[in-house]
Amino acid sequence: MKHKIDVVKTLLDALPFIKKFSNEKIVVKYGGAAQTSAELKEQFAQDIVLLHLVGMKPIIVHGGGKSITQLLADLGVDTTFIDGQRVTTKEVMRIVEMVLSGEINKEIVSLLDNHGAKAIGISGKDGGFLKGMPKDFENFGYTGLIEDIDPEIVDNIIDDDAVPVIAPIAGSNILGHPGFNINADLAASRIAVALEARKILFLTDTPGVLDKEMELITNLSIEQTEALKEDGTIQGGMVPKVDACIEALRGGVKKAHIIDGRVEHSLLLEILTSSGVGTCIEL
């Protein structure tokens, strides 16, 4: 009986958050261990389906860097990085699109469908959703930046009561152009702004933003975040994550969260509990 009462209490505790975020768009950047562990994949799908069933509008933007690197190695295609960003030749671009659109995107859609949510997978090329431009073609090739976003196709998916699953590949207006490989964190941030999302969450392989003693910082303002970057507390791979958070917040998103995707049901814990499990950044 006690277990049953605990279940009811948990549901009641979540009720204020369900009411608060009902009918709100929530962008989730999906990557890291949560994207490679079979158990965590299932839990992620369950979390998204539950959020969708209680009236929220989750939008998934996924990466796939490790899978891309593995397939490139298997095929004997050289790949290089500059400052942590992949140099995308035309041959690499073809494989990037194969992995992101043809493999990972479809796997996520299938997972969500299997757990009871209607999901529709697209890339930024579909419906003219994302238009790209070169980051620095001479050095980075087809690694790009987002020039323009037309949210109509994603809005239509949401209006059809489905979950959009987006591969971060941008199209071009040039006939025959292979498109652009877009950093998934950057894509998620820009998409959240364009779709007027309430929240954006980044699933990572760390607990969140850590202080110099390696303790989790649960809440930050933009100013505090910038200061932690300047003094070197935030460094390495966390820098582009917090930059993406800041860009989203300055574009009108209310809150940005960096959470540990290795924690069971981390999405639900962050959205439906008062304490959360990661770092929340806000204006």
Curated annotation (Swiss-Prot):
Signal peptide extent: none
Catalytic reaction(s) noted: N-acetyl-L-glutamate + ATP = N-acetyl-L-glutamyl 5-phosphate + ADP
Record bears the keyword Glycoprotein: no
Superkingdom of the organism of origin: Bacteria
Gene Ontology molecular function, alphabetical: acetylglutamate kinase activity; ATP binding
CDD domains recorded: AAK_NAGK-C
InterPro entries xref list: AceGlu_kinase-like_sf, AcgluKinase_fam, ArgB, Asp/Glu/Uridylate_kinase, Glu/AcGlu_kinase, NAGK-C
Chief site of localization: cytoplasm
EC number: 2.7.2.8
Protein family according to the UniProt entry: Belongs to the acetylglutamate kinase family. ArgB subfamily.
Function: Catalyzes the ATP-dependent phosphorylation of N-acetyl-L-glutamate.
HAMAP family: ArgB (MF_00082)
Name of the protein: Acetylglutamate kinase
Species of provenance: Sulfurovum sp. (strain NBC37-1)
Gene: argB
